[in-house]
């Protein structure tokens, strides 16, 4: 019998497609929750409603929840993974692990709803995977040379 996995992402980039292919090769049935970035309040709310409905259905049936990047789209699926006692993973790519004051860049540059949710997400997931080791503990070169704080 096939195992189920749920993958959450904003845009279906090549690395997301690769992960889906890898999971399918490992005999997983892959449920997908795509939550594209939207600028209007209505579209934002509709995305959250879709995430809730899909999370209830998909996460409850999955062995694992995998989320590409930490942002709004991660919060609701993570809550349902906790509710259904499922393993959850966030894959951190950079923006969601840095503060670059000079360029005013990074999820934690501003202290608003996004950064608050991101901190909550990091505290709730089972595991945090980084795409590069410098995102785990932070990059000392980036800190010294450019005053960029990184790391989860």
Language model segments and positions:
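A short, charged, and often flexible helix/loop element on the N-terminal side
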Residues: 31-54, 67, 104-109
């Amino acid at each position: 019998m096939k195992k189920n996995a749920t993958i959450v992402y904003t845009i279906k980039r090549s690395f997301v497609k690769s992960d889906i292919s890898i999971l399918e090769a490992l005999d997983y049935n892959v449920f997908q929750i795509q939550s594209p970035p939207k600028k209007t309040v209505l579209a934002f709310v509709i995305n959250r409603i879709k995430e809730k409905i899909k999370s209830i259905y998909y996460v409850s049936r999955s062995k694992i929840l995998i989320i590409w990047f930490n942002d709004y789209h991660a919060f609701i699926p993570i809550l349902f993974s906790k509710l259904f006692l499922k393993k959850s993973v966030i894959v951190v790519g950079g923006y969601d692990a840095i503060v670059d004051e000079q360029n005013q860049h990074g999820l934690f540059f501003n202290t608003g709803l996004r950064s608050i949710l991101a901190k909550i997400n990091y505290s709730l997931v089972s595991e945090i995977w980084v795409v590069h080791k410098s995102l785990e503990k932070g990059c000392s070169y980036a800190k010294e040379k450019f005053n960029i704080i990184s790391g989860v």
